[in-house]
């Protein structure tokens, strides 16, 4: 590819296996040493020659180390307040029914669980609380924080037009007739009629973002031990990242939306495996201080990239076959050779105090 050259030969950097034997001495499955058989190392293409082993018509697989320059940064687009409806009877796939111990969110790299509502009725959809708005000035931003001028209540909004659905951030509730103001947009309006939502059962679940040591898996909710199963349909609301094209994620991959992804909001990853002989890091990785080469699995059937569309998962999420990397939402990255060196430029702020005389 562009800005890629093959490294000089060493046995640990080149692995060639025979997939289909030709008329040479090599058999299917053989691993072939390439010492003295490579021409073109240091360039963008190489030629491997061994007529004795390969003969004619052999098919082989080569895994090689390359040097890549001018690496392209991948972006993570912040998506706020995505809604997922979980109903019974739609599919037999595990993770798609309210009573399943594990609920699939249908996509990877979810960074925040906002709320889970239970309708308490098998034939009724769960809903978030909402209010009508009058005298609106400006346009609210999806996912932003709003504050009530009279009550002091704060919440994050789901939709931006009346009636506005919201998730309270405090134990204080809004009151009719008060003015609300958006923190990010500066939009304002007057609350009219308030409508209660379904029962909030967020505390019944543990949240799994789907991050793994070497890839981004499907995010999920795991019902806590001794928590009762829901009696109705569920509405799950969460924030997630959409992955762009490129080679790796850095601190600059994260873009703020509605004051919900500032520098301090960039997630931390807790490793599933920790080397006890390594003093640092101790299994905690601040992604704002990390080169992240992990690939992301594709979205599960029933998801939509349109943020305002309510998802309803219909496919299998947790079996090995469902971890595909070539469909909608998937993101592939070439991984680095262990122990290799990464060279990059960085900018940082150096504080200084000085006296003016």
Question: What do these predicted regions represent?
Answer:
Residues 1-357:
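Subunit-assembly interface segments of extracellular/virion macromolecular structures
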